[in-house]
Amino acid sequence: MKKITIAIDGFSSCGKSTMAKDLAKEIGYIYIDSGAMYRAVTLYSIENGIFHGDTIDTDELKRRIGDIHISFRIDPETGRPNTYLNGVNVENKIRTMEVSSKVSPISALGFVREAMVAQQQEMGKAKGIVMDGRDIGTTVFPDAELKIFVTASAEIRAQRRYDELKAKGQETGFEEILENVKQRDHIDQTREVSPLKKADDALLLDNSHLTIAEQKEWLMAEYQKAIKA
């Protein structure tokens, strides 16, 4: 059976990562979480004094970007990949509200995207991968055989994020999360480098009112079509 590249793009908190992880596990592909890579760069910047309040010392980050190496390793207990920053597991650290509130401006920096895209393209050379993010189908893998663009209303996405953080014991107000979601949408869609947009040949999936099972059924059907094409 031929192996393909699957690119899943879309807005923040649409459940892209869960969807991509589950699909990769189901079909035996490698999953690459591009959003986690930008979160890891953000965490590195926070921990290394590159942020001064909300201001990024771009010159310092540019000097250090070559020292930031991100990889994914499967957790033997969960069967899911964890994100490693320079050899250290940072999967939980990169999911905090502090990182969420700072990741969009980091992602908007051209030299950061250039470095991450190079790492992603290296990971994806052998095909048989599922990658999710903002510009996978448009910039990272424009020749991907299956491209999906995921959307849902801002309110539904904020509620999902609220529930996710609450389950982890991180208490944050719904309004703050909704504002963060809307702010990230604006930054992601208007940035100069690789703005968030649907590739012309991507399939649109609005999962506002879909169950996980319905979404999975749709994805598997599209995957089957793509490998037979």
Curated annotation (Swiss-Prot):
Q: Which InterPro entries match?
A: Cytidylate_kin, Cytidylate_kinase_dom, P-loop_NTPase
Where is this protein localized, as stated in its record?
A: Cytoplasm
Catalysis: reaction(s) = CMP + ATP = CDP + ADP; dCMP + ATP = dCDP + ADP
Instruction: Report the SUPFAM superfamilies cross-referenced here.
Output: P-loop containing nucleoside triphosphate hydrolases
The alphabetical list of record keywords is:
ATP-binding, Cytoplasm, Kinase, Nucleotide-binding, Transferase
Any one GO CC term of the record? cytosol
State the Gene Ontology terms under molecular function.
ATP binding; CMP kinase activity; dCMP kinase activity
Chief localization: cytoplasm
Q: Where does ATP bind?
A: G10, F11, S12, S13, C14, G15, K16, S17, T18
Q: Name one Pfam family in it.
A: Cytidylate_kin
The record's Gene3D superfamilies line, in alphabetical order, gives:
P-loop containing nucleotide triphosphate hydrolases (3.40.50.300)
Could you tell me the Gene Ontology terms of the biological process aspect for this record? Answer: nucleobase-containing small molecule interconversion; pyrimidine nucleotide metabolic process
Which Enzyme Commission number(s) are listed?
A: 2.7.4.25
Which protein family is named in the record?
Belongs to the cytidylate kinase family. Type 1 subfamily.
What protein am I looking at?
Answer: Cytidylate kinase
Species this protein is from: Bacteroides fragilis (strain ATCC 25285 / DSM 2151 / CCUG 4856 / JCM 11019 / LMG 10263 / NCTC 9343 / Onslow / VPI 2553 / EN-2)
Gene coding for it: cmk
